[in-house]
Amino acid sequence: MRHTALLPLVSSFIVPALAQIPGQTTVNATVNQGRFGNATYDYVIVGGGTSGLAIAARLAEDPSLSVAVIEAGGYYELDGTVASIIPGLAAGANVGTDATEYSTVDWNFQAQPLTSANDRSLRYNRGKTLGGSSARHYMVYQRGTRGSYDQWAELTGDESWGWDSVFPYFQRSVNVTPANMTGRFPNTTVTYDPSGFNKAGGPLHVTWPNYGSPWSTWIEQGLEAIGILPDTDFNTGTLNGSSWAPITINPLSQKRDSSETSFLQQSLKTTNLTVYLHTMALKIGFDGTTASSVDVRSPVGRFTLSARREIIVSAGALQSPQLLMVSGIGPRETLERHGIPVVKELAGVGQKMWEHPFFGITHQVNLVTATELAINQQALLQALNQYKSQQGPLTSAGFGVLGWEKLPNSTLSDSTNEALATFPSDWPTIEYLSIDGYLNGWHSAADQATGNGQQWGTIAVALVAPLSRGNVTISSSDMDDPPVFDLGFLTHPADREIAVAAMRRIRQAFAAISEITIGDEVVPGADVSTDEELLDFIRESIVPVYHVAGTCAMGREDDPEAVVDPQARVIGVNNLRVVDASIFPTLPPGHPQSTCYMVAEKIADLIKKGN
């Protein structure tokens, strides 16, 4: 039985109430809207997403500079549903991986069939809105390990990308508010290291929701029973243990905080930043090998935006390489196949794609989880009433506790250990996620109403040291044609072995909290027991965490696979940078929004200093 009629109820009930919530950002619908027609700016930024709005806002702080942002979408608060705003409805906002799923604030891309996962083709979330994917994800804010960024320094030949050097840029973007324990249960106490943050940081808010789910408290116990200790910190360079996850929400309103509600809204109050809404970047124009303009299409027609100084591409890890390729930068064979004149041959464009896949185990449980909101209208009404006072389960994004573990070498084969040796020693192998509901592949939000009134609890794992790589390419010279991308899940044998080992670890954690489970394991089921059976289940249920990165990788200029240099400048051309997750040399363990902001802060600082 599935209950799918509750979201309209949410909209009709909560929309009038949003205006009453303190700390709400008023949407500035004019956003210093650029006039549709040819224009020239000092900096033209393609993409108003996580990194794009951050770097735009920082550059616009200089009153002598003119800065324009090209964004294909609009405001998610206006174009989307309230599920984009309320953390507890994020699952409904994100929709699922089925091809029939659709969001008005998303590109709704479809990945190529997964050759090592039963040829499943998954719909893939990418924000088509101001804020980009910071308006779409589950808001987790945590940083990678010290070693992961020190490895960036090694790969780029630039020590300024090491942990000690990038740490201040992490701090610059955010301000942290300690958890308000008034509405949280006593056993949901938050522990963190304040030294990870700076009181002068901002404008992005980081805090903890005013609700900690009972399910997550049990996950914390289960993880501790298998050696994953609680009360660790996620933002000072170590990921080893579990804790309540900090998320990017406004501490007063308990609403999502994105690059739009933070960086853009602050910038609109103090600068002359110009934003072109619902405007599609079609092609970068060059004078020889110097980037000079961007051809765009708006609701009223096509025109050209020229840049006196630089064009900065921040279109995300799928569309930044796509835009480079349709503009003449990329693998020669690809460009020539589509009749695109070669401006600069760069074989690495679109290659070395990283992503974190995840899957998990679900049990029926004897406590109330977020499942109740999907199957019980009265419970949802009660939660909505609580949310009007910034309390209750809708302040939380459907999870609470995250955990990290580096699997012992003794549990893995020599070949897998050898493959994992390419990662720094402090890099965890897997991340545990406490999901307050049902998971068996992420088909749609209606998954949460599976069954006949049961309460579900899931422990999921993400492979955060993946060895499989994907790629993205183009099908034509037209940006209107979606990018063609292969996530590459499970193509490396080490990932398959680690995935099976992770499933067995989840079962050990569940065994330690058996007093709250009802009956046998539901997903995948107790009869799925051999390595082969577990791997078959993983192939059929593995889904992305939407952390795609690395497709315009940063590296040394003599690295044949590098696309940008350590200053994010596209190699071999002038006045063109890429600033988003596509330039990550590796994808640090965990959730990348913190690193997207850090990269934007660092490159903005370099530009301001004349580099």
From Swiss-Prot:
Q: Which cofactor does it need?
A: FAD
The superkingdom listed in its UniProt entry is: Eukaryota
- Alphabetized GO MF terms: flavin adenine dinucleotide binding; oxidoreductase activity; oxidoreductase activity, acting on CH-OH group of donors
Known glycosylation sites: N28, N38, N180, N187, N240, N272, N409, N471
Record keywords: FAD, Flavoprotein, Glycoprotein, Oxidoreductase, Signal
Q: Which cysteines are joined by disulfide bonds?
A: none
Q: Which of this chain's residues are annotated to bind FAD?
A: T50, S51, E71, A72, H137, Y138, M139, V140, A581, P592, Q593
Q: Where is the active site?
A: H547 (proton acceptor)
Pathway noted in the entry:
Secondary metabolite biosynthesis
Q: What is the documented disruption phenotype for this protein?
A: Abolishes the production of aspernidine A, but accumulates the intermediate aspernidine E.
Give GO terms for biological process. Answer: secondary metabolite biosynthetic process
Endpoints of the signal sequence: 1-19
The UniProt record lists the EC number as 1.1.-.-
Annotated family: Belongs to the GMC oxidoreductase family.
Functionally, this protein is described as follows: Dehydrogenase; part of the gene cluster that mediates the biosynthesis of aspernidine A, a prenylated isoindolinone. The starting point of the biosynthesis of aspernidin A is the production of orsellinaldehyde by the non-reducing polyketide synthase pkfA. Hydroxylation, methylation of one of the phenol groups, and prenylation, presumably catalyzed by the prenyltransferase pkfE, would be needed to yield aspernidine D. Subsequently, the cytochrome P450 monooxygenase pkfB is responsible for hydroxylation of aspernidine D to yield aspernidine E.
Can you say what this protein is called? Dehydrogenase pkfF
Name the species this protein comes from. Answer: Emericella nidulans (strain FGSC A4 / ATCC 38163 / CBS 112.46 / NRRL 194 / M139)
